[in-house]
Amino acid sequence: MKNTKTAFITFFPAVPDNMGSSTVVNSRFKSWPSKKKLFQLSHIKKINNKNTKTIFIRKEKPLNKILSLPKLICSVFLYLKNSKKKIIIIEGASWIFYSFIVFFSLKLFFLKSKIIYISHSIESEIRKKFSNIFIYLLTKYLERLMFKFVDIATSVSKYEKSKIKKLYNVNTILYPNAINIDYKVGT
């Protein structure tokens, strides 16, 4: 995977590792074979180094995240612009609106890039239970577009894989959540 760069994108703090989704993302990131960088929105800690770029937001509110998307997109663009092969991994453990805006924008900049959408759940089903009808319908529409137009879409279980096929007529790759355990148990 020489000359390949991968941008991992999260809309929540993945570093430092502070919740289940961040543990899964960190495990995936650490085991990814090519040159890579994690781009995250975070209200916890601003971490900027060789492997991580944080767009810091004061409070974890949807409007703050929406207003931070242009800066996130610009950061990813600057990282990938000189790379021959570009892979963009969008971690879908946040509202699909953020994922869709980033997907659409980066696809305009990098037509030949490969974009992978890592679905952590069927979000429209969650929004149907816990959000108003407008947010539910918008989520379902954007989720349909994401599954249809990304280069690779994943699902975390056989149940969700079949449900996505039924809802959106899209075949996903089964990619269960996993973590890497890097410590040894003492005897």
Task: Describe each PLM feature range.
Residues M1-I47, S83:
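N-terminal subdomain of nucleotide-sugar transferases
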Residues F77, F104, L108, E123, ...:
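Membrane-proximal helix-turn-helix segments that form the acceptor-binding/catalytic region
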Residues S119-S131:
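A short, histidine- and acid-enriched strand-loop-helix "catalytic/donor-clamping" loop
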Residues I179-T187:
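Acidic anion/phosphate-binding donor-loop and adjacent secondary structure
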